[in-house]
């Protein structure tokens, strides 16, 4: 019944019974778990997974290989929330109840957990966040130095390097054109 609901599914995409998939969603070969909510106009690209009870907003792009965590295994207190218009780059991982606010862009390979430092480096002083990415932020993988008993080592983090601009929108606009003109990909 996907076609009647205006949902485009490319086999072997799977959405478990109990997941909500809205009109206009495109599921490339991907997996959407029980209790997940995927809102209209969203693209779940090849080999992306949407975990149990995750909340994905309108017009989101989950690129190839993205992993959006669920709440069932391991048990989590809060779902991952990806707000409207966000772009999640290839092979990103977003788990443990992290919230990505409206129109944020995560570059390829960003890994966000509840304890990952998300450091805004755009100003004269860094600003640290944990558990959420501010709206329209552009985020890339990074690292910071941490002292351990055995010495100083690099620990992964995420760096906010700017805000979404028209040039960013242009890079992500192909997705919108494909949806608007109902082009099968």
Task: Put a short name on every predicted segment.
Residues 1-7, 136-137, 141-185:
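Terminal amphipathic alpha-helical/low-complexity segments used for targeting or macromolecular assembly
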Residues 7-147:
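Structural signal for interior beta-strand "rungs" in well-ordered beta-sheet cores
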């Amino acid at each position: 019944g996907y076609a009647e609901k205006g949902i485009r599914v490319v086999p072997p995409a799977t959405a478990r019974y109990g997941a909500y998939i809205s009109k206009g969603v495109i599921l490339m070969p991907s997996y959407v778990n029980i209790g997940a909510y995927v809102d209209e106009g969203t693209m779940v690209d090849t080999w992306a997974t949407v975990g149990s009870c995750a909340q994905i907003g309108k017009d989101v792009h989950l690129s190839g290989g993205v992993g959006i965590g669920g709440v069932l295994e391991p048990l989590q207190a809060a779902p991952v929330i990806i707000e409207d218009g966000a772009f999640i780059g290839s092979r990103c991982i977003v788990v443990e109840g992290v919230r990505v606010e409206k129109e944020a862009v995560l570059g390829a390979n960003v890994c966000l957990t509840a304890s990952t430092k998300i450091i805004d480096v755009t100003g004269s002083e860094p600003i640290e966040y944990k558990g959420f990415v501010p709206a329209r932020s552009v985020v890339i993988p990074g690292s910071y130095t941490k002292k351990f008993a055995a010495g100083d080592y690099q620990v992964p983090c995420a760096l906010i390097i700017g805000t979404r601009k028209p040039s960013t929108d242009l890079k992500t606009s192909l997705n919108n054109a494909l949806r608007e003109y109902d082009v099968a990909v």
